[in-house]
Amino acid sequence: FSQSKPQGLVPTPSISFAAGAVKPGTALDLACGTGRHTIFLAERGWHVIAVDGSRVGINLMLAEAEARHCRNRIEHYVKDLEAQPAEFVIEPDGYDLIADCFFLHRPLFSAIRFGVRPGGLFVGALHVSAPGLDNRHRFVLKQGQLVGMVRDWGWKILYESKDLDTNRAVEGQSTEALVAQRPA
């Protein structure tokens, strides 16, 4: 991240949907970057735990949150989410919403599954291999893999989006997003 003001603070449609689907509670924003989802949720009354490996990204988020008068609803941690042993632990039944947008680290899925409280939401938006291409990159899922995994958990899919981003399609990627609710 550059040290300038964060750009692109518009949340993904899946986050916008989730914020209106349940009453505000405690949210976990994994790999929050410069905080577009953290700030969006905090402005809507959520208490947000924001985690990212970049101190620069966290600092940009905090400055923007201060300017938007929602800093008091944000806890932040500079932690490597891929570290072994884990630098940040997702507490079981600890969150009303967990967001994982454009950060794929497969070992987190189990912790996400059990970290969402009953009745709570998982918001996932991840890159997937484009039609007809295989999954050669470790940060890309196969098409339908995210939805299939969450359905295997027994969760209800409330929102689903498949987006072929023509800019990313050149790289053989598109995006899939969902909002899923853990059974109460």
Task: Identify what each model region corresponds to.
Residues 47-52:
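Conserved SAM-binding motif I beta-strand of class I
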Residues 54-56:
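Conserved SAM/SAH-binding beta-strand->alpha-helix loop
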Residues 87-97:
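A short acidic, Gly/Pro-enriched loop at the edge of an enzyme's catalytic core
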